[in-house]
Amino acid sequence: MGFRLLHLHLHGLFRSHDLELGRDADTGGQTLYVLELVRSLAARAEVDRVDVVTRLIQDRRVSADYAQPVEAIAAGAGIQRFAFGPKRYLRKELLWPYLEDLADQLVVHLQKPEHRPDWIHAHYADAGYVGALLSRRLGIPLVFTGHSLGREKQRRLLAGGGDHQQLEQTYSISRRIDAEELALAHADLVITSTRQECDQQYSRYG
C-alpha cells in the first residue's frame, strides 16, 4: 500500500485546468504550486492517492467549476470541495470565522477508513489552522507550508507607514499570525522555499 496524502488549499479559485492566475490576490502562485505538486505526487509509485480540499463556491460571478463537489486532476488525484461560510466567493481574510466549521466537517469525513490520509499538508495560515485542528483531533501527521508569513507582512507594512488598526481591518493580521503559531506548534514537518525564509522569517515565531 502506498501513501494517501491530503492537501488543504482553502482560499482563492482552485480547479484542475485553466487556472485564473492573477484574477485577484488570492489566486496566484500558491494555486499553481499546489496543483503542480499534486500532479507530481500522483505520478510517484509510492503514492496511492492524493487529494486537495478547497472551498465549494456558488457564485454567479465565478465559474460553475468551483461549485462541483468533486473534480479529477489526474489518475489517483482529485479535488474535494467543502462548503463553509456563505455560498459566495470571499477573500481569504473573511474566511476565519468559518474555518472551525470546515474542520468539523473534515473530522467526520476523514474518520472513514477509505478517506483517512497518512499525511495532511496545509498550505498558508488558514489551511494551517484547520490542519492543526485535524492533526490534534485525528492523530494524523501534519506538514505545513506557509508560502508567506503574517509576521513578515506585518513588519513590511508597518515599515512602509501602515498602522496596526489598518492591518487588522484589512488583513486580520493577528488571526493570521495566531493561526501560523498554532500550525507551527503542531507541524511534524515545515517546508520553506529558501534559506532566507527559514532563517529570517520563521525565526520570528516561537
Residue ranges: model-predicted function:
Residues 1-206:
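Catalytic cores of nucleotide-sugar-dependent glycosyltransferases that transfer UDP/GDP/TDP-activated
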